[in-house]
């Protein structure tokens, strides 16, 4: 079926198996040895998968500086061999890495310029890019769009029995529910992902979600109970969260949450109202308004009203 590439295909699949079973060292050893073979054969599809896995292993083990240049290295190979159809997946790979590094500007640029349009006919070759797009929606706070796209893909993946992608979709659907504060729905979606992950031993698929997987699993275990499988993922996800603390943090999550009163005062600030006018609107003394304003400045890490309004606009608080 795969001809001369069969050995490389097998070794890449085996490397993924090692990785999912939390053996990053042997996965990296195997996939790194396969890359020169794929380059010699100019098999860009297999080469892309191999280099993307290599990049993932490096990034998730805290080697961000070594991982980032791989995107341009793959891009150079694509240009040289003419496999332009892989460009969509490559651009998505860069956006995926930006999610882990907390680089929202790169994520937003990819969404606006290169991300596939899920409102058109879904193209299976873009499945990787669709999965990345769900993550990007989650990062910028568009939870409903993330959930809609995940449900679209789940319908297709169930029919095609693509269990690894299906597991990821259920997990991302749980992610969207968690971000939206719907924890019962989160547990339902996460349970579906866990059922598949446990059957096929997709340990890293879930653990690589880091701090948010920890948050989801803690809530899940309180409601549905714990077992050795979820405990193992919880430990590994905690390690990822420590190495990559900014992964999937929405802009507002970088700052201490504002109280309801502080949010209301901040909105009046954005309208250009004076402290006197805000005091009248909120039926509070000027001193009280100024006290709450100081709390806003401290939480948003700014020094004055204009900076607070600007920061709130950047982080989606207004």
Predicted features along the sequence, with ranges:
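Inward-facing hydrophobic residues that define packing positions of alpha-helical scaffold repeats
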Residues: 31, 71, 78, 108-112, ...
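Structural register within alpha-helical repeat arrays
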Residues: 14, 54, 94, 133, ...
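Alpha-solenoid helical repeat architecture
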Residues: 1-13, 38-53, 65, 78-94, ...
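Helix-turn-helix DNA-binding segment
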Residues: 245-294, 298-299, 307-318
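Linker/hinge segments immediately adjacent to helix-turn-helix/homeobox DNA-binding domains
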Residues: 132-139, 148, 175, 179, ...
């Amino acid at each position: 079926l795969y001809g001369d590439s069969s050995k490389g295909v097998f070794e890449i699949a085996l490397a993924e198996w090692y990785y999912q079973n939390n053996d990053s060292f042997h996965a990296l050893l195997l996939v790194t040895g396969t890359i020169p073979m794929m380059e010699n054969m100019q098999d860009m599809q297999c080469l892309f998968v191999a280099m993307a896995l290599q990049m993932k292993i490096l990034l998730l083990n805290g080697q961000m500086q070594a991982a980032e240049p791989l995107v341009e290295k793959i891009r150079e190979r694509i240009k040289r061999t003419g496999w332009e159809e892989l460009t969509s997946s490559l651009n998505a790979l860069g956006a995926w890495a930006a999610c882990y590094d907390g680089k929202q500007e790169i994520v937003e640029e990819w969404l606006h310029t290169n991300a596939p349009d899920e409102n058109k006919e879904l193209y299976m070759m873009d499945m990787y890019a669709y999965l990345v797009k769900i993550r990007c929606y989650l990062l910028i706070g568009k939870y409903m769009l993330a959930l809609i796209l995940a449900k679209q893909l789940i319908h297709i993946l169930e029919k095609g029995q693509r269990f690894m992608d299906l597991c990821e979709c259920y997990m991302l659907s749980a992610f969207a529910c968690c971000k939206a504060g719907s924890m019962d729905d989160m547990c339902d979606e996460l349970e579906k992902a866990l059922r598949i992950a446990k059957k096929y031993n997709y340990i890293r698929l879930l653990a690589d979600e880091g701090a948010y997987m920890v948050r989801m699993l803690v809530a899940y275990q309180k409601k549905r109970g714990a077992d050795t499988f979820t405990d193992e993922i919880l430990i590994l996800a905690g390690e990822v969260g420590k190495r990559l603390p900014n992964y999937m943090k929405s802009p507002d999550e970088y700052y201490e949450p504002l109280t309801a009163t502080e949010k209301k005062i901040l909105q009046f600030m954005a309208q250009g109202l004076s402290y006197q006018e805000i005091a009248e609107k909120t039926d509070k003394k000027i001193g009280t308004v100024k006290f709450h304003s100081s709390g806003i400045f401290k939480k948003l890490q700014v020094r004055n009203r204009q900076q607070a309004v600007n920061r709130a606009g950047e982080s989606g608080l207004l």
